[in-house]
A protein has these predicted regions:
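Charge-rich, low-complexity N-terminal segments
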Residues: 1-98
């Protein structure tokens, strides 16, 4: 999956999650992406910035963390860790204004 398609497909989900969290304007998003998606962290962040234009994510800072299969990471929103499989698409952090 390329960066453009991944960002475009994730935007509606990110908007729903922002709404569930009561955020009217998102200022920062950190995503954990498995390496099996074959994307570059820099290119994916730039693509998210492009698809965020004219949305409540406009000008949000985007950070992409690429993880390898069998990597131990802290599970977002939980105290425990998880072993990655390389296909992750996880929201690690979302900040903004209510």
């Amino acid at each position: 999956m390329n960066e453009q398609r991944l960002a475009a497909e994730m935007l509606p989900e990110l908007e729903v999650i922002a709404g569930m969290r009561g955020l009217t304007w998102v200022t920062r998003v950190t995503l954990i992406v498995g390496s099996m998606h074959g994307v570059s962290a820099t290119s994916l962040a730039e693509e998210f910035e492009r698809v965020f234009a004219d949305t409540n994510f406009d000008d949000a800072r985007v950070e992409i963390v690429i993880v390898q299969p069998q990597e131990e990471i802290k599970a977002p929103g939980r105290a425990d860790t998880m072993t990655t499989n390389g296909w992750e698409l996880l929201i690690s952090k979302m900040e903004g204004r209510k």
